[in-house]
Design a protein with these regions (language model features):
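Flexible, low-complexity segments enriched for small/polar residues
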Residues: 1-160
Length: 160
């Protein structure tokens, strides 16, 4: 936090934010069904994910929109925002999409993102060439995209 306040605004709007906030129950019963298995998932049948009961098309879009904004601009009051991430180490790897994705997936999911998903992220990143001579904004956009795609993976969302 740049000002020491660590202020995170309300995140309960599912269309633009996380769809949940501290001390605000997602259901009137204040609990998730413990055996919940989402329909049509790629998860193993024995995997239960109770917290996915609040997941739907709107909340998924809101989650991605929230992350896209937070990854690039930070969160909190002010301009620049009160809390922003430093991508210095990632910028050093920006011309090597594979190394960048490997680092991001290691940091965000303890290496749980599958090789297939990592390859898909690398392929997406390589659609926009980035060289040492590229502008800082182009380099940052590649880092932002790598972080966003890693955070959209089920292996990031369901950490073991």
């Amino acid at each position: 936090s740049t000002n020491g306040g660590w202020q995170i605004p309300d995140q309960s709007n599912p269309g633009t934010n996380l769809g949940q906030s501290p001390l605000r129950s997602p259901s009137v019963f204040n609990f998730y069904r413990p055996g919940f298995v989402p329909a049509s998932t790629t998860l193993t049948p024995s995997v239960v994910v109770p917290e996915f009961q609040i997941l739907n098309e709107s909340s998924t879009g809101g989650y991605l929109n929230f992350n896209m904004s937070t990854i690039s601009a930070g969160i909190g009051p002010g301009n620049p925002r009160d809390m922003t991430a430093s991508y210095t180490a990632e910028l050093a790897l920006v011309t090597d999409a594979t190394a960048l994705v490997r680092r991001v997936c290691l940091l965000l999911s303890a290496g749980q993102v599958s090789a297939a998903n990592q390859a898909a992220i690398v392929a997406a990143l390589e659609n926009t060439p980035v060289t040492a001579a590229s502008s800082t904004s182009t380099k940052l956009n590649r880092v932002y995209a790598a972080v966003l795609m890693a955070m959209a993976c089920a292996q990031y969302l369901i950490q073991k």
